[in-house]
């Protein structure tokens, strides 16, 4: 078995057997990997709390057929503040689900860096976590080649009204007045200003996403619906928000 060293962020931790955990880790150089940390739930485990969900770690592991086996782990940043507040944790879990859906196992340092910056923004912020989650999902969709259309109607390219707009996930964007009269069944109305806020989120650095106010739930719904309609791994979003980083 080949031994390797990597850096990654723990996305999910699931109990396995009497003392082990199976971890999904998004790594900087290899994308998503699934590992087993043996004995991690024992009181005197050598891993301690270094492999908690959303921790950033350097680790060593042996490659296996289905699961790699972690032998060492060093904490680089625990992001403990993300786990200590439910609203932060829910946003982080939502981001993990979107990452699973859009990136899968594909390695991309830009994705790793985006996730790290998003967790940093969640931990340092006091509010606006839904905006951070929406910004992360939107930017990751762009990186992954699944960007929604924000410059006009998804069907005809015409102007989208500020009021009475509808979002059509399968079409990949918003609908103008003419096209919304024949809107697909998956479309839904959005509050005034939703398209404008999405355009702002696309342009703003992720660290500034929480500065906006209002429309958090609408933005999260739009981004999530878009990912569900287009991402190859969208089934990972079928679980309720909050379970992606949880510890059943």
Swiss-Prot record:
Belongs to the RecO family. It comes from Rubrobacter xylanophilus (strain DSM 9941 / JCM 11954 / NBRC 16129 / PRD-1). This is DNA repair protein RecO. Involved in DNA repair and RecF pathway recombination. Keywords: DNA damage, DNA recombination, DNA repair. Pfam families: RecO_C, RecO_N. GO terms for cellular component: bacterial nucleoid. The keyword DNA repair applies.
